[in-house]
Amino acid sequence: MERIKELRNLMSQSRTREILTKTTVDHMAIIKKYTSGRQEKNPSLRMKWMMAMKYPITADKRITEMVPERNEQGQTLWSKMSDAGSDRVMVSPLAVTWWNRNGPVTSTVHYPKVYKTYFDKVERLKHGTFGPVHFRNQVKIRRRVDINPGHADLSAKEAQDVIMEVVFPNEVGARILTSESQLTITKEKKEELQNCKISPLMVAYMLERELVRKTRFLPVAGGTSSMYIEVLHLTQGTCWEQMYTPGGEVRNDDVDQSLIIAARNIVRRAAVSADPLASLLEMCHSTQIGGTRMVDILRQNPTEEQAVDICKAAMGLRISSSFSFGGFTFKRTSGSSIKREEEVLTGNLQTLKIKVHEGYEEFTMVGKRATAILRKATRRLVQLIVSGRDEQSIAEAIIVAIVFSQEDCMIKAVRGDLNFVNRANQRLNPMHQLLRHFQKDAKVLFQNWGIEHIDNVMGMVGVLPDMTPSTEMSMRGIRVSKMGVDEYSSTERVVVSIDRFLRVRDQRGNVLLSPEEVSETQGTERLTITYSSSMMWEINGPESVLVNTYQWIIRNWETVKIQWSQNPTMLYNKMEFEPFQSLVPKAIRGQYSGFVRTLFQQMRDVLGTFDTTQIIKLLPFAAAPPKQSRMQFSSLTVNVRGSGMRILVRGNSPVFNYNKTTKRLTILGKDAGTLIEDPDESTSGVESAVLRGFLILGKEDRRYGPALSINELSNLTKGEKANVLIGQGDVVLVMKRKRDSSILTDSQTATKRIRMAIN
């Protein structure tokens, strides 16, 4: 206060004011501070000071011919004085106004194209709806968010190459455009920007906005997709929020959302297959999201979500070093620990082997609806500070933290046996067993935890076992805070390894992620996800499995046909028939398979019985391990539409219907494609006789005895000749092949030879 009084005193003397306002600044240090370097030290002051001058702007000399010296009001628009240090003229801000009103108009066609991101934003805001303003305490936490709606996901280097190629195509310098997206964008932009008069530098800046994801670490309460972030200043203050629904959608948000859904579906499906890692990779490589290959998106998209990170790890990409437990992202902020196996007894006297972390550590926990700071020692929770949207969210965080602490009273709070299994029916590891148990019911856990008296600390309240707030008491070591805990800000990525059960570990062997951590939440993807892998056929239910299986056979019929006759076992083991098995009643799968395989063998052995439609119809049933039995079936049951439906062995049914005239196959009334039968099939007789394993030598030769029937042929030894009765009573001489390898050619040559032998 004294200083201020003294200064006021000084200022009241006129001499002081004169010295301060009139004296030149000639202290070297000050001059140096404000004149060294190109960087403006006080931009806003400079701007105000410049704009207070009469001619603060410099312009090219040509302006004097294009703009009059005075405007209609008689104000001077430019000065006859040249700018010191350049051959430009000094111009008044009024000249800009005159130019905007009366200057030449050029073509505006390129503006919406170059400034696309701005035009799009205006459209989104025009169609967005702003709701009421609510006044309430905002729990904001800093998260890394995308601040640039509507961008492609190119890396900075890829974008730089595209921009150089589009804006400065004649500049020297090697540019390699390799990725699909780079080539498409370059072609598109070159066409759009032909004869564009906007300054190349501006075009380059705007292209960068369109091509690269820009992220910032911002305090957010609520939506984090880029469409919400662009109106952050309108939707949340320190003590208020305004509801907002975006108008329209932007591709980058749609890609992020659809990628998460695809990754979750793929990880869930892979986890239950025989070789989860191989299956996961096969599915990632054969899936497209909005027409772009999923693996390309994974390489470029920085989204951090458990399933997405598992897919990235499988592809050998780096991921964040934080780990996931109970749906929360944990990041260790200090301390260290070593792992040791320990056997513990639950309240139900069940023995659990847990990996105990020995040592003092501090973590931040960040979830979708709650965040926390956790301090723990060996099997002891020291302190937990939680903040969340509501009681439910806070309870979820507390359960996860308590289980993670591995305290004895938590393990003793278990009632009943722990036998939770994952989707593949394997037992979960002990830590996830405990987590699932208490997520189902945490009453005993909270009651047994213990409570303590608390001191009054600003911004903190206690929480009782029934999750109500209190200022006097709280669960031991646990407090609820008004302030959120910021997400981990670093974008550092680490090298990880993944085992065949999809457990992701860092280089020190700590498990960062596992399929148990993948959310079960179902959503509807905003972009079309096309899973080409047969493993994903069942995602849309039994009907989709049925249709996809038959479509696959039809699409690959030429190779399937060859395998059917030459190497049936390999065909039956194809993974494309795996999903179909879930439609066949378990008890009878083996019998069906045995029956169909026998039927197929007869078809191979008996001339003229090859039947394309029947083979296609029954093939999926032959994939199950066969049981030998004498059972014959006239129809086979599949479980679709909530009940058993029949496929007739001979003839059409609602499930499988082949129209001979139109050559179309319909499955459950849905068109499944065109099915072309072999030319020989429709005209049975000599033409359809396919003597597999026999060479036709010519016409009947009496020296080899009476004509045998086709069934008697099987008794011949290799190289032995015989007459055989085929088709409509014609007889030809055949020899049983010495080698099996040429069997397939028989079906092609047999028809020709038979015709020659008979004619």
Curated annotation (Swiss-Prot):
GO molecular function: RNA binding; RNA-directed RNA polymerase activity
Main location as per UniProt: virion
Site features described as Mammalian adaptation, chain residue numbers: K627
Domain of life: Viruses
Short sequence motif named Nuclear localization signal, residue ranges: 736-739
Compartments in which it is found: Virion; Host nucleus; Host mitochondrion
Signal peptide: none
Keyword Ribonucleoprotein attributed: no
Keyword Secreted: no
Alphabetized UniProt keyword annotations: Cap snatching, Eukaryotic host gene expression shutoff by virus, Eukaryotic host transcription shutoff by virus, Host gene expression shutoff by virus, Host mitochondrion, Host nucleus, Host-virus interaction, Inhibition of host innate immune response by virus, Inhibition of host MAVS by virus, Inhibition of host RLR pathway by virus, Inhibition of host RNA polymerase II by virus, mRNA capping, mRNA processing, Viral immunoevasion, Viral transcription, Virion
Cellular component GO terms, alphabetical: host cell mitochondrion; host cell nucleus; virion component
Subunit structure: Influenza RNA polymerase is composed of three subunits: PB1, PB2 and PA. Interacts (via N-terminus) with PB1 (via C-terminus). Interacts with nucleoprotein NP (via N-terminus). Interacts (via N-terminus) with host MAVS (via N-terminus); this interaction inhibits host innate immune response.
Known function: Plays an essential role in transcription initiation and cap-stealing mechanism, in which cellular capped pre-mRNAs are used to generate primers for viral transcription. Recognizes and binds the 7-methylguanosine-containing cap of the target pre-RNA which is subsequently cleaved after 10-13 nucleotides by the viral protein PA. Plays a role in the initiation of the viral genome replication and modulates the activity of the ribonucleoprotein (RNP) complex.
Family from the record: Belongs to the influenza viruses PB2 family.
Protein name: Polymerase basic protein 2
Lineage: Viruses, Riboviria, Orthornavirae, Negarnaviricota, Polyploviricotina
Gene (name only): PB2
